[in-house]
Amino acid sequence: MKLYEMIRDEDVSGVSGTGPVAEVVVFDTGWTAVSFYGYTADVPNVIVYSRFSDAEKIHGHEGRTRLVERKSPAEFVGKVDWRPV
């Protein structure tokens, strides 16, 4: 399993903003979970893909988004301001 933080350099969609926008977990099976912080749209969400390449194709914004590997959750720069009730 690998942990990444999605850093958006340019927001072409105008939805998630720039800077740290999501936490990404890539499981050994290839399944990938993307958990968006929800800063600009105020709609935090989690999306699961059966392949990492699908998540990258949809959210990579043609190279305008980087994935920075994190060794532990404590290294994430972004902050989640909400918790489910």
Question: What are these model-predicted stretches?
Answer:
Residues 1, 74-85:
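Short intrinsically disordered terminal tails
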Residues 1-3, 27-30:
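A short, compositionally biased
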Residues 1-13:
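A short beta-strand micro-motif
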Residues 4, 20, 32:
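A broad, low-specificity signal marking well-ordered, structured residues that form hydrophobic/aromatic
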Residues 7, 68-70, 83:
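A structural detector for beta-sheet-dominated domains
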Residues 7-9, 25, 35-37:
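A generic structural motif
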Residues 14-27:
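Amphipathic, interaction-prone secondary-structure segments
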Residues 28-72:
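Acidic, aromatic-enriched beta-alpha/helix-loop junctions
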